[in-house]
Amino acid sequence: MQARDPHVNVIFVGLMGAGKTTVGRAVARRLDRPFFDSDHEIEARTGARIPVIFELEGESGFRDREAQMIAELTQRENIVLATGGGAILRPENRKLLHERGLVVYLRANPHDLWLRTRKDKNRPLLQTDDPKAKLEALYEARDPLYRECAHFVIETGRPSVNGLVNMVLMQLEMAGIVAKPLQA
């Protein structure tokens, strides 16, 4: 990725529930760029929901599909991409994401993530007796990997989606990806 390349991909990473899809879709709208969610693309291609893929192929099989999808999507230019929470587990994915786009890590604390995901049955890694403890463990394990991959870290805290979008756009402006702040 070259600095000041207006066609660079904008890629969101972070744990499940961090807001990658919601914020990514809003950023894409504001930048008038196509939006892709790697998990949704996998579901569309396979015709199966993520939990079914996990059940039939295991996490390893799903991660293979995810790596293929990331490689394919990041060959495009000028897109906004939301990745799955575990996309950064493989070193080759982290390298590819970092090289083929400007990576924004939406960082949320485990408690906020739990509040956002506790009723979502489409998250196979949280189908445990203690999903909050699982999120805490995932956060501890993955936070360094997200940081390794990211160009920017945005603390999600409690701002509105529009507030987060504005923070992302400000970072993109400073990186030369957008010419000026875009108003909602």
Swiss-Prot record:
Q: What is its EC number?
A: 2.7.1.71
Question: So where does substrate get bound?
Answer: D39, R63, G85, R142
Q: Which UniProt keywords apply?
A: Amino-acid biosynthesis, Aromatic amino acid biosynthesis, ATP-binding, Cytoplasm, Kinase, Magnesium, Metal-binding, Nucleotide-binding, Transferase
Instruction: Please tell me whether the keyword rRNA processing is annotated for this protein.
Output: no
Q: Name one GO cellular component term.
A: cytosol
Q: Which GO terms describe its molecular function?
A: ATP binding; magnesium ion binding; shikimate kinase activity
Q: Which reaction does it catalyse?
A: shikimate + ATP = 3-phosphoshikimate + ADP + H(+)
Task: Name the GO terms of the biological process aspect.
Answer: amino acid biosynthetic process; aromatic amino acid family biosynthetic process; chorismate biosynthetic process
Which Pfam families does the UniProt entry name for this protein? SKI (PF01202)
Q: Name the pathway.
A: Metabolic intermediate biosynthesis; chorismate biosynthesis; chorismate from D-erythrose 4-phosphate and phosphoenolpyruvate: step 5/7
Q: Could you give the cofactor binding note from the entry?
A: Binds 1 Mg(2+) ion per subunit.
How does the annotation summarize its subunit structure? Monomer.
What does the record give as the function of this protein? Catalyzes the specific phosphorylation of the 3-hydroxyl group of shikimic acid using ATP as a cosubstrate.
Quote the protein name from its UniProt record. Shikimate kinase
Protein source organism: Burkholderia thailandensis (strain ATCC 700388 / DSM 13276 / CCUG 48851 / CIP 106301 / E264)
